[in-house]
Amino acid sequence: IWVQPAAGDAGGSLGAALAFWHQELNNKRETNPNDSMKGSYLGPRLKNTTIEKELSSLGANFQKKTEEELISVLAGALSKEKTVGWFQGRMEFGPRALGARSILADPRSEKMQKELNLKVKFRESFRPFAPSVLIEDVDGWFDLKYPSPYMLLVADIKKDMQITMTSDQEKLFGIDKLNIARSKIPAVTHVDYSARIQTVHQETNLRYYKLIKKFKEI
């Protein structure tokens, strides 16, 4: 089963484009058993010159780095519990940030979920975040047997990655109980030990794949 990642009203624009392509322009329809959206990166891509001009107009301090340098610096920052604004390539189409316009942080940090919610997203501290994991590593962390490139599937965290609450912690109530670390990746673990997962594939988002791989090595 393949689920359209933008299955709401916004996805109707894709259907309208396809209807025009096939019905008005008389192009033959070909069904594809694979994922033809290839990551759903259908939005605009900004040129470096455009980005530099905008940063300069804001008086922002910035540096130009090679891709290898950029990935190394950002992976190091993430490992030190820094928050990264990740902006690269074409923008995602649909409801989820999938490694093109994303806020990134270390899922192992016990404080990161609260800090991102309160200081960056300006919302309730207990709201969950979702993990991006290399497709070849997903089985080591989650009970998930299928690719989930669009962050649509929820699966339990592996038992050996979970942290069982103590009897005293079980007695806690409300936000105090929600703040208890439930796994080795507490920033992306739901209260029921599940997570909403994005599998990352080098075929569809190579730069994001490289960043996560570098972070893994650190």
Predicted regions and their residues:
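Flexible beta->alpha loop and helix N-cap segments adjacent to enzyme active/binding sites
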Residues: 2-218
